[in-house]
Amino acid sequence: MIKLDVLRLLEEQGKTKYWLYKQLGMSYQNFSKMINNETKSIRYENIETICLLLNCTPNDLFLITDE
């Protein structure tokens, strides 16, 4: 299973979920689902924006697990 690992990146950079939520400008419901890996898809636009905000690559954003 592929999971979004953005919480680790935020922690490493000393940033909060609230900071990212405000930067993305999306609804809190959609943001919460995305952050908590409760969504089936993520728009490329959001992946790109997160990468730019956190100065990372898409490879840094995702984690592959055995679940």
Residue ranges and their predicted role:
Residues 55-67:
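Short C-terminal boundary/hinge segments that cap the last helix of small helical domains
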Residues 1-16:
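A short, Lys/Arg-rich alpha-helix, primarily the initiator
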Residues 16-33:
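Short alpha-helical DNA-recognition segment
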Residues 11, 25, 36, 66:
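Residue-level detection of the helix-turn-helix DNA-binding "recognition helix"
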Residues 39-49:
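Short, basic-rich loop-to-helix N-cap that marks the start of a DNA-contacting helix
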Residues 30-33, 46, 60:
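Residue-level recognition of specific faces of alpha-helices
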